[in-house]
Amino acid sequence: MVIVSNTSPISNLAKVGQLSLMQQIYGRILIPCAVHEELLDERAGETVITAVQSATWLEIQSVQNRELVDELRTRVNVGEAEAIALAVEVEANRLLIDEQLGRQAATDLGLNASGE
């Protein structure tokens, strides 16, 4: 199963010390570079940064379709745009994204998006 995640599902679980649940449920999770950068930004907080740095099951992957990212950027932020584009590229089984506009953009592209 191929899973791609946006920033919020990872950071929210990391903040409450439950990031390992993602690994238990999904195994490996792909994240685009923009999401990785957001997770390691000092604004994310030390708890999130430390959890992400030790989560060896998170795989960072570059998005190739920059045109799709640019198109999505008219609707969502860069992390969401890259996560959606990566999910399209790798034909992900599921995209974990909790922002409503991001879920709608993903659904419009035929992706199975989940998160609330």
Task: Describe the role of every protein-language-model region.
Residues 1-94, 100, 104-111:
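Active-site-proximal, substrate-binding regions of enzyme catalytic domains
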